[in-house]
Amino acid sequence: MTVLIHVLGSDIPHHNQTVLRFFNDVLAATSENAREFMVVGKDDGLIDSCPALSVQFFPGKKSLAEAVIAKAKANRQQRFFFHGQFNPKLWLALLSGGIKPSQFYWHIWGADLYELSSGLRYKLFYPLRRLAQKRVGCVFATRGDLSFFAKTHPKVRGELLYFPTRMDPSLNTMANDRQREGKMTILVGNSGDRSNEHVAALRAVHQQFGDTVKVVVPMGYPPNNEAYIEEVRQAGLALFSEENLQVLSEKLEFDAYLTLLRQCDLGYFIFARQQGIGTLCLLIQAGIPCVLNRENPFWQDMTEQHLPVLFTTDDLNEDIVREAQRQLASVDKNTIAFFSPNYLQGWQRALAIAAGEVA
């Protein structure tokens, strides 16, 4: 039998490491279809830390795509599971027949679905990608992204699946002991990536709350981002007093990041697409409500799980935030579908579908 090959076709270290470690620690022991990987990027100790996996690394998108296409042509029974598909050459291969629909299964990460880049080459590529997406064997995504995708590709099969956020289920019932009164602390964005639109988000927070709240902006990832970090810092200082603005330029380890999140009262995410699900999960777990752009379809997943959702277009004040905190405290977090370990069932089903084990 030909085993399923998983493809991480772009060098996105943080997300790629999360996926590899999840497969190594959780899925590989029980499924032979959870062990073979082709990855763009450097080893950086991943092979040693993921002994249950067979991982082949490639220096760039082009070399990986060529290897995938060669395997696909050599054996039409070979199936591939693409995790976050940011590799144009692979889309073109699907469109041209180099990879067949029955070989192509795609877990949507959010940024790979939306057409937000305004550059000429992207505008030329997006129509071709849309045509290729009609040929995908099956897509796996959040409820909101499935709904978004189905509007333009109603005939493509879609299955619910959540990114494997690193979570400790024992923290679901831990009461957040932060004082829910006085000056609020607001987390702005989930990383230093420009897609967070930090400057616009800071202006929106200031418009809602003025200089009465403390704003925390985590920007330690991605690396080599100093110029943009300084741009955000200066924009923040034009709006907030120095004691009310904390721009973090160093990457935080997981436990330190968790501690930071638990010091917040509200998460504020202005981006108009699904992203940052890991940060959203950790905030919700800590009883901290989130403000989303109404164009971000993840609100559908949150309401499906009976979670309070605030929108950037709402008139926000402290009373509304405190009420959302109270509502969130009443939710049984052990039942939330996109929390660990509840998302495991979706992953087991996704593997079976992509491998052809179930119809």
Swiss-Prot record:
* Record key words, sorted: Cell inner membrane, Cell membrane, Glycosyltransferase, Membrane, Transferase
The GO biological-process annotations, alphabetized, read as: enterobacterial common antigen biosynthetic process; fucosylation
Q: In which pathway does it act?
A: Bacterial outer membrane biogenesis; enterobacterial common antigen biosynthesis
Q: What class of enzyme is it?
A: transferase
Gene Ontology terms for molecular function:
4-acetamido-4,6-dideoxy-D-galactose transferase activity; fucosyltransferase activity
Query: A cellular component term (GO) from this record?
Result: plasma membrane
**What's its membrane topology?**
Peripheral membrane protein
The region annotated as signal peptide is: none
A Pfam family it matches: Glyco_transf_56
Enzyme Commission number, as recorded: 2.4.1.325
Main location group:
membrane
Question: Sorted alphabetically, which HAMAP family does this protein's record hold?
Answer: WecF_RffT (MF_01002)
Entry similarity comment? Belongs to the glycosyltransferase 56 family.
- Functional summary from the UniProt entry: Catalyzes the synthesis of Und-PP-GlcNAc-ManNAcA-Fuc4NAc (Lipid III), the third lipid-linked intermediate involved in ECA synthesis.
Q: Which NCBIfam families does its entry note? A: PRK02797.1-1, PRK02797.1-2, PRK02797.1-3
Specify the protein name: TDP-N-acetylfucosamine:lipid II N-acetylfucosaminyltransferase
Organism this protein belongs to: Escherichia fergusonii (strain ATCC 35469 / DSM 13698 / CCUG 18766 / IAM 14443 / JCM 21226 / LMG 7866 / NBRC 102419 / NCTC 12128 / CDC 0568-73)
- Please name the gene that encodes this protein: wecF
